[in-house]
Amino acid sequence: MTFEPQMPNWGLIEFEQHKEKLVNYHDWLYTTGIKTGLISKKPKQFIWDEFIVHSLYFHHLIKKYNFKSKEIYDLGTGGGIPGVPISIVNKRKVNLIDNKKTRIYEL
């Protein structure tokens, strides 16, 4: 079965503008993220739908409610979810915070 990333209408513009980086992060989660224990073993489509798309919905809300000037903190980031996808499409600093140093070093 071939993995093909898809995006709901609310995220199509950002997806098209940042597709390569988002897919690269997805692939990193699927390989390194699973291997190092940042995320549990999941199918590629699940990782895309549940981690990437859901993360980008936060970006959609940031735009919708005009929170662009606010600082963003991802508490308990684990594998960088939702912080990394948000920072990819938002092109701004997202503070990734986790209580396990190994997770932060891996990111």
Placement of each model-derived feature along the sequence:
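Class I SAM-dependent transferase core
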Residues: 2-3, 7-67, 73, 105
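Conserved SAM/SAH cofactor-binding pocket of Class I
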Residues: 56-107
